[in-house]
């Protein structure tokens, strides 16, 4: 067999096909072969050992979403900082200045949201 540009990806394609097949096959097998014994007690909701009270859908305060978005922003910053730190010497001053601009932009954004009161939990 003559190697083609896609030959190195053949094992990956086989693994992906097998994983996809198993992901479809296993739920089908359990659905068809598993026991079905519905009862009233199984249909009730259960929450931490006590009966649930109130509606299942409740509104969350916006501050939770703001904190979650800030976490994602600074988590992405950490993802960008790692490769930069690994290649710090190879990048030289240009890489240093680029990362400095990136970090300063994030710090300015943090100061802005701090001044706007987005991190003030009591308000």
From Swiss-Prot:
Q: Which InterPro entries does UniProt cross-reference here?
A: NAD(P)H_OxRDtase_bac/plastid, NADH_UbQ/plastoQ_OxRdtase_su3, NDAH_ubi_oxred_su3_sf
Q: Which organism is it from?
A: Myxococcus xanthus (strain DK1622)
Give the signal peptide range. Answer: none
- UniProt record similarity statement: Belongs to the complex I subunit 3 family.
> Which reaction is catalysed here?
a quinone + NADH + 5 H(+)(in) = a quinol + NAD(+) + 4 H(+)(out)
Gene Ontology CC terms = NADH dehydrogenase complex; plasma membrane
Which gene codes for it?
nuoA
Q: What is this protein called?
A: NADH-quinone oxidoreductase subunit A
Q: What is its EC number?
A: 7.1.1.-
């Amino acid at each position: 067999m003559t190697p083609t540009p896609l030959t190195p990806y053949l094992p990956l394609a086989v693994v992906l096909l097998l994983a996809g097949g198993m992901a479809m096959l296993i739920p089908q097998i359990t659905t068809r072969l598993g026991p079905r014994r519905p009862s009233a007690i199984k249909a009730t909701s259960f929450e931490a050992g006590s009966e649930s009270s109130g509606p299942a859908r409740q509104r969350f305060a916006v501050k939770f979403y703001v904190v979650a978005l800030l976490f994602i922003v600074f988590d992405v910053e950490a993802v960008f900082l790692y490769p930069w730190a690994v290649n710090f010497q190879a990048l030289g001053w240009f890489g240093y200045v680029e990362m400095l601009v990136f970090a300063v932009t994030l710090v300015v954004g943090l100061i802005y949201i701090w001044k706007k009161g987005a991190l003030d939990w009591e308000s």
